[in-house]
């Protein structure tokens, strides 16, 4: 069902954010938006090559292709992917970065599982880039804040609704 798709959730939350969070704030100029989008695509390519193409694949070879080995490779690569986002502490609020790390870790587990299931890194590159573009739209389209700072400003009801959806 389309409602169960992560892309539906991304689109739904993006439209809500664009429509209601900042109605009086002007958008960034189109060339800057397109540059951001290209940047997000390139980040998706680079992170997938490193975290799924190299790290997850190496872990899978180490732990084996039995069910337990696949799970272990997914979990370890996901935790490493989440930890890599700790570098955002240099410029963003700690709570937002913590939430971003938790999200990135769970996303890393999911993307590793998709990569192992499909055997196609381009599938995860597409999904990762689409999610990064959606995050950019939510956090930076208006040129006012980062994604981590956006998450820091969320009230409890918004964070709980995301948690319920993920469960």
Regions picked out by a protein language model, each given a short descriptive name:
Residues 3-50, 56-66, 149-150:
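Juxtamembrane helix-loop-helix connectors linking adjacent transmembrane helices
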Residues 6-13, 78-87, 129-141:
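Aromatic-anchored segments of alpha-helical transmembrane domains
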Residues 25-37, 90-103, 152-160:
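Juxtamembrane helix-entry segments on the extracytoplasmic side of multipass membrane proteins
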Residues 38, 76-83, 98, 102, ...:
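Hydrophobic residues within alpha-helical transmembrane segments
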Residues 45-50, 54-55, 59, 83, ...:
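Active-site His/Glu-centered metal-binding helix of metallohydrolases
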Residues 46-76, 93, 116-120:
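Membrane-interface helix/loop boundary segments of multi-pass membrane proteins
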Residues 100-114:
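Hydrophobic alpha-helical segments embedded in the membrane of multi-pass proteins
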Residues 129-167:
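C-terminal membrane module of polytopic membrane proteins
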